[in-house]
Amino acid sequence: MDLNKLAEALVPDENVKPLEYYEKLYPERDLPKGAEVTRLAPSPTGFMHLGNLYVAIANERVAHQSGGVFYLRIEDTDEKRKVEGAVEVIHSSLKYFGITFDEGADLTGDYGPYYQRQRAEIYHAYARDLIRRGLAYPCFCTEEELEKTREHQTENKL
């Protein structure tokens, strides 16, 4: 199988740039040794839940105590469940609990965009590369088939 042809067929985006472009655009951060870069990536599907709040507190502390960076990226890929105004709720909820970001959604930063849907071109470039190298493969399952598989695995504790 010609993996280059497969990669082009699966990821035909003409806007995809070479990986070197993205590596130059997003160089390694100039941070102190031991500094951690952490993120919170909630989905704008309603109110913040305790799981997101817990992760936000832990990640903010780890990043800031290590001299690193804490950023907010919005996982806005689930259009079916997206709730209008949810991003604002996320911001106000985190602000209420005193959680601050160094960069991210609705803030400046050199490593954006910070909305998942706006990063598609980047993901396409890396997906294409993985397919070309034989490290990723396509799945043509329907949502129904995946759900059936998930149910089977859950029932059988697989």
Residue spans for each PLM region:
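N-terminal Rossmann-like or analogous alpha/beta NTP/dinucleotide-binding catalytic cores
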Residues: 2-155
